[in-house]
UniProtKB/Swiss-Prot annotation:
Localization per Swiss-Prot or TrEMBL: Plastid, Chloroplast thylakoid lumen
Job description of the protein: Essential for photosystem II (PSII) biogenesis; required for assembly of an early intermediate in PSII assembly that includes D2 (psbD) and cytochrome b559.
Domain comment as written in the entry: A 7-bladed beta-propeller torus, about 54 by 55 Angstroms, with a depth of about 25 Angstroms and a central pore.
An example Gene Ontology CC term for this record: photosystem II
Protein name: Photosystem II stability/assembly factor HCF136, chloroplastic
Gene from which this protein is expressed: HCF136
Keywords assigned: Chloroplast, Photosynthesis, Photosystem II, Plastid, Thylakoid
Stretch forming the signal peptide: none
Species of the source: Spinacia oleracea (Spinach)
Protein family membership: Belongs to the Ycf48 family.
GO biological process, one term: photosynthesis
Length: 20
């Protein structure tokens, strides 16, 4: 899912399980 902006990728946790 490349819908996230560059800053969003840095802001969100690295673990996808935490984001979803």
């Amino acid at each position: 899912e490349d819908s996230l902006s560059d800053w969003e990728r840095v802001y969100l946790p690295i673990d996808p399980g935490v984001v979803l």
